[in-house]
């Protein structure tokens, strides 16, 4: 009989739930993966600006999940944006926690058109900005800005999946990550 692995995701967004389920199914093929999304407050603005605000949002979601739910792993993803010296970009922070260790990872950057980033600075969420620019509906629960700007060669889910895949490394090799010398 297969062991069941309970995963709590700090969001009800199907893109985030699917990304988490994908990586746990990949890393634990012998297990039955029970992946549930829950509403978890980020404690940051709906559209985080800057790396720190984005990371803190993901960590807050995971910490809320740990406090209010019981699971083998807790996962959160938070999308943010920032103005860099080379231009505006969007990215995500991911956090995975198994009650013993908490690992923070980050996705790659997607360059953002300056006009779209400026709308974020005025308080709009990226999903809403993209829906207006591309005449779409609720793109944040589909391919996201990433899908729209890459002509669907990458998507919000594929980007979360890659970041989560990399963030799992310390859980897979704890003997190496626990060493300091």
Question: What residue spans do the PLM features occupy?
Answer:
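N-terminal polybasic phosphate/anion-binding patch
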Residues: 2-71
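Anionic-ligand binding patches
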Residues: 46-181
């Amino acid at each position: 009989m297969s062991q069941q692995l309970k995963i709590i995701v700090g969001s009800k967004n199907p893109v985030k739930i699917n990304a988490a389920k994908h990586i746990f199914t990949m890393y634990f093929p012998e297990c039955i993966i029970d992946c549930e999304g829950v509403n978890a407050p980020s404690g940051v603005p709906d559209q985080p600006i800057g790396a720190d605000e984005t990371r803190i949002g993901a960590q807050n979601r995971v910490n809320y999940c740990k406090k209010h739910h019981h699971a083998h792993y807790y996962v959160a993803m938070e999308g943010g944006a920032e103005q860099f010296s080379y231009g505006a970009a969007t990215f995500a922070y991911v956090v995975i926690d198994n009650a013993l260790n908490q690992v923070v990872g980050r996705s790659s950057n997607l360059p953002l058109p300056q006009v779209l980033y400026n709308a974020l600075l005025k308080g709009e969420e990226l999903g809403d900005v993209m829906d207006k620019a591309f005449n779409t509906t609720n793109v944040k629960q589909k391919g996201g800005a990433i899908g729209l700007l890459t002509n669907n060669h990458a998507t919000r889910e594929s980007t979360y999946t890659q970041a989560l895949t990399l963030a799992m490394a310390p859980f897979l090799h704890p003997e190496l990550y626990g060493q300091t010398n």
